[in-house]
Each structure stands twice: as C-alpha cells, then as structure tokens.
Amino acid sequence: MDVRSFHWWRTVFFLIPVIGVYTMVLGTLSIASSLIDRSGHFAHRCARAWSWLILATTGVRVDVRGLERLERGRTYIFVANHQSIYDIPVIFASLPYQLRIIAKESLGRFPFLGWHLRRTGHLLVDRRNPDRAGILRRWRALVGEGLSLIIFPEGTRSPDGRVGAFKAGSFLLAIEAGLPVVPISVDGTRFVMRKGHLTTRPGDARLLVHEPIETSGLAPGDARALAERVRAIVAGAVTHDEAGAEDARGSATAPPQRNPGAAARHVDA
C-alpha cells in the first residue's frame, strides 16, 4: 500500500470515526452547558478540549510563538489567514483566551449548530446584507464580557496556502469599536488537510502571534489601509508566500506597538 492510500484509509476508517465520537461527546456537553451558562465559557472549554484531542489524534504538532506579546486580561480581535479546516483547532488549542468566532450566516442553517453558536456568543454575519450597527452592538457586548474575537478576513480557505486579500469590513468594525487587532500567521495546516480534500495527514503546524496594532486614533476611512497592513504582516510569515513577504518588508516602516503585560499563556481561558 502506498503512502497516499494509507492516509486515505487512516482518515476514513480511523480519524473520521474517532473525531466523530469526540464531536458527539463534547458537542453534547457544550450544548447542555449553554442551557444554564449563557456566557459560553464552559462551551469554549469544550471547544479547546475538542481541538486538543483532534490535533493529538491526527498527529499535528503545533509550534506556538509570540504569546508574550499579548497583555493579560485584554480583549483582542485576532486576525488569521485560512489554509485549512485545521486552522480552527490549531487556534483554539493555542490561544489561552475566551474566543468567539465571526462566521458566515450559512452556518446558522445547520440543525442545533446555528442555535448553539448564537447562544454561546459567536457572531454569524450575512455578508450579502451585513447589519453593521447590529454587529457593532454585539461586538461591544462581547468586549464588555471580556471576550476576544477571531476572524478570517480572506472569507474562505486558500487552495495553495497563499494569503489572499483581506476584506476591510471587519477592520472597519474594529476601528469603530476601538479594539486592538492582533495579526496571526498560521502555517503548515494546508499539508495536514487541503481545501477540497478528505485525506488528512499528520504534520507540523506553526502559529505566530504578531505585535498587537492599536486602532485608537484611526478613522473609518483607514480600514482598507489597516486590512492591507495586517495582510502583509500575516503573509510575511507564511512559507512560500513571496508576494506577502515583499509586502511585509514594505510595512516594516510602521512602528511596533508592544503591550508590556504578562505572557498570555497565564490567562485563564
């Protein structure tokens, strides 16, 4: 049996059934907890446990760097590139923060999933008809509860790992809410599971946390420039993204903004 066939059989007859069990058990606990815990904190812990189990079972080792750049107790908007479905467990397992995802409204059509996501604080956005005022109001409510947000501004997974253009809408909301933006570079997950492919392989992934970018003092008209700056930073740390690396070198003139707080690995998530 060749290597490709082995990984296909391993995916279909081992990983999918085992991960299915993890999802049913932890998903049931998460849904049950949301009936009494509207904060979603316990549901988030279930999501982190689910992420750790998936990565361990698949054989994905994650090298996490840059957590010391984050300030303990602060709320952030984490902005990441999107290579693979595995980006989500990598991020949830690596960032010791209470995270909520900004996702497509279409997820809300799945039985139980949409109801559960909304109930535990995740934001589902209709990109065709976004209610900016409503989204901003919900963002501020989450910030008031000490929650951080994770967004994938490319809007879809990259088929080849290259970082696509970042949509400016989320950055406009970040500016209006006055929230710091943290660029996150995720690399290697495309070799674990590529877009449009079922086969999953063990491998190494890397998550790099860049310096937070303060949005105080920025105007709504700066959203596009902020999106391009963050995209350049993220792409510059992704392997083989030469265009992104050139953009990142061009953005190096922007002064770094460091938060001198305690390392985020000590944050209670």
Show where each model-derived region lies.
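Non-catalytic C-terminal accessory region of glycerolipid acyltransferases
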Residues: D2, A133-A269
